[in-house]
């Protein structure tokens, strides 16, 4: 007597996912052109966590100390003075609840050594709050999880403000890019063009994810070059988005009154509360355990 096994389509999909391994075969089949939708869906702050999230943040830079002591109230104050952000916790402090991230692609890269080929994994991660802030991170590591984790940190450090505007009359909230902007990486050139309200984002899947995370609702795009190279395509789009604040429009021609940099304004506070946290951590890690 033969045995007949019945399985539902959901069980078959789960079995295929378990066999597939690294998120759709490392981007095979389509080169990031939209197949395997929802690969990174749900990868918000709630998707990852553990012991690292339970620890209290101890800032190690002057900017981090000013942020934690509530001397700096928003990210815009940091961008106004072009202060470099060296700690990803600063972005979590301001955008923690609204920040979402998505893995664009994971691909294997190889290096020829004397012992043979060394394979590592390269992760591309986009991050944004869907309201005027977006970042892109690229990380290569021996393990997929380590690469994704490192790419998320680098994406947070690269978060930039996004300038939004109107296509026609200034009615309602800004919904598109204020002017035509162009970004480039390698041979890929991406151009963002303002669009009427209700048009949506007319683009390939990769720029569409970045533009949605940036909070742009309507936009036309034009791309040329080898757009099949997902890394350069994403970097060119991110470059175009970051250039929205690189030019002046007539409404910004009026004279800007600059104030003191936070480092100058809170010099006494930084000098009074200074502690060498990084040195203490290094010494504690270097002390061997004796029984």
Where are these regions (language model features)?
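Ribosome-associated RNA-binding proteins
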Residues: 2-291
């Amino acid at each position: 007597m033969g045995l007949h096994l019945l399985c539902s389509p959901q069980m078959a999909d789960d079995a295929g996912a378990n066999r597939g391994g690294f998120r759709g075969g490392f981007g095979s089949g389509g080169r990031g052109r939209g197949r395997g939708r929802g690969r990174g869906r749900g990868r918000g702050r709630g998707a990852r966590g553990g012991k690292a999230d339970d620890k209290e943040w101890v800032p190690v830079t002057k900017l981090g100390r000013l942020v934690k002591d509530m001397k700096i109230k928003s990210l815009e104050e940091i961008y106004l003075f072009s202060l470099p952000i060296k700690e990803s916790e600063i972005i979590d402090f301001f955008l923690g609840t609204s920040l979402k991230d998505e893995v664009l692609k994971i691909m294997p890269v190889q290096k020829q050594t004397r012992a043979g080929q060394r394979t590592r994994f390269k992760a591309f991660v986009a991050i944004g709050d869907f309201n005027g802030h977006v970042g892109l991170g690229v990380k290569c590591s021996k393990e997929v999880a380590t690469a994704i984790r490192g790419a998320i940190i680098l994406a947070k450090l690269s978060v930039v403000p996004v300038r939004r505007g109107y296509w026609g009359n200034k009615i309602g909230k800004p919904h598109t890019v204020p002017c035509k902007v162009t970004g480039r990486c390698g041979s890929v050139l991406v151009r963002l063009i303002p669009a009427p309200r209700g048009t949506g984002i007319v683009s390939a899947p990769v720029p569409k994810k970045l533009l949605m995370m940036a909070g742009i609702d309507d936009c036309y795009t034009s791309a040329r070059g080898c757009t099949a190279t997902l890394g350069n395509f994403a970097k060119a789009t991110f470059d175009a988005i970051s250039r929205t604040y690189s030019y002046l429009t007539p409404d910004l021609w009026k004279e800007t009154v600059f104030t003191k940099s936070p480092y100058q304004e809170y010099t006494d506070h930084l000098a009074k509360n200074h502690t060498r946290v990084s040195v203490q951590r290094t010494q504690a890690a270097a002390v061997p355990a004796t029984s």
